[in-house]
C-alpha cells in the first residue's frame, strides 16, 4: 500500500483518451505524435514502466515518470474455485479493495469487473450492497483489473457485473469503455462487453454514448415487490427503465438481457412469469434466470431446478429466449451477489 500512496500524488495516464494523452505530450514539449505513442504503450503494449517506452527519448521518459504514473499495480490476492473460476483482489487506494472474477468456459474467458467499492443500491440479496458504498473507481482502476489479471492476454469478454452499480459511476465507466473500444486504445469490439444496471440514472447516456450490450437486473415484475428486494426501485422505477429501453432500437447487433434471480416461494410462480412476459413486451431481449447464492443474515432461498425449469418453459411459451445461468465460483464467494471486500478492508485497518 505504501507504493500506491506515493503514486497517488502523480497524475495517472491509464484511462486517458488519445486527446488527453496528446495534451500531455505537448505540455511536456514532445511532438504531437507522441500522444499516439503513449496510447500504444499504455493500451496495446500495456507498459508497466516508462522505461519500456523505447521509441520515446530517455530524457522525455524521465520527465514523464517525474509527473505521471501509469496506473498499473498488481492484484494482492487470488482464490481458485473447484470449477476453474478465479477471484482476484485489487487494492484501490488506502485500505480499499475490489474483487474481479475470471470465468473460463471452453474457448471463452470472461472477466467480471467492479466499478465501485461497495454499492449504494443495498439489494437484499447482494453482499456488495451489505458493505455499503466506499467510493467510485476511476477509469484507471477499472482498466487495471483487466490489464493485471494473469489471464489478461486470453480474455474474450468483459462484464461490468462485479462490485457496484456501473451507471452510478457513469463518467468513469464510459471513459474505461472508450479506452477499451476505440482504435487508439485496445480496439475491442463493443460486442465483447456487457454492462449491468438496475436502471440507474446513467442509462440514457450509456445507450447514447456506447455500443456495448446491456443487462438489466430485474428480479420481480411487480414494482412494490421489487422495491422490497431492491430499494433502488424507489429512485429508479423499473417501468421507467423499460420505457427508456423500449424507445431505443435494439434491432441491430447490440443486445439487451434481463437478469432474474429466482427465489423459492417469492418470485418463481407462473403469475410472475406471465407478468414478466407482459412488462417486457416490445423489447427484443433474453432473460437469464439465476440461482440465489446464500449469503449471511439473509433468509431468502433459491428455487429448485424443477421450478426454475418450469419458469423457463413458461417464458419460452410467451416467445422469449430464456436460459438458466450456470453458477460459477460459489465455493470461493465469487458467484452472483457474493462479492464483498469488507473482510479485506477490516484486516487492512487492523494492520495499519
Curated annotation (Swiss-Prot):
Annotated Gene Ontology cellular component terms: cytoplasm
GO biological process: rRNA base methylation; tRNA methylation
Record keywords: 4Fe-4S, Cytoplasm, Disulfide bond, Iron, Iron-sulfur, Metal-binding, Methyltransferase, rRNA processing, S-adenosyl-L-methionine, Transferase, tRNA processing
Keyword Repressor among UniProt keywords: no
Binding site for S-adenosyl-L-methionine: 164-165, 196, 217-219, 293
EC nos: 2.1.1.192
Disulphide linkage map: 112-336
SUPFAM superfamilies in the cross-refs: Radical SAM enzymes
Active-site residue list: 99, 336
Cofactor section: [4Fe-4S] cluster
GO molecular function, one term: tRNA (adenine(37)-C2)-methyltransferase activity
Cofactor note as given: Binds 1 [4Fe-4S] cluster. The cluster is coordinated with 3 cysteines and an exchangeable S-adenosyl-L-methionine.
Catalytic activity: adenosine(2503) in 23S rRNA + 2 reduced [2Fe-2S]-[ferredoxin] + 2 S-adenosyl-L-methionine = 2-methyladenosine(2503) in 23S rRNA + 5'-deoxyadenosine + L-methionine + 2 oxidized [2Fe-2S]-[ferredoxin] + S-adenosyl-L-homocysteine; adenosine(37) in tRNA + 2 reduced [2Fe-2S]-[ferredoxin] + 2 S-adenosyl-L-methionine = 2-methyladenosine(37) in tRNA + 5'-deoxyadenosine + L-methionine + 2 oxidized [2Fe-2S]-[ferredoxin] + S-adenosyl-L-homocysteine
Function in brief: Specifically methylates position 2 of adenine 2503 in 23S rRNA and position 2 of adenine 37 in tRNAs.
Note, other: Reaction proceeds by a ping-pong mechanism involving intermediate methylation of a conserved cysteine residue.
Listed name of the protein: Probable dual-specificity RNA methyltransferase RlmN
Native species: Porphyromonas gingivalis (strain ATCC 33277 / DSM 20709 / CIP 103683 / JCM 12257 / NCTC 11834 / 2561)
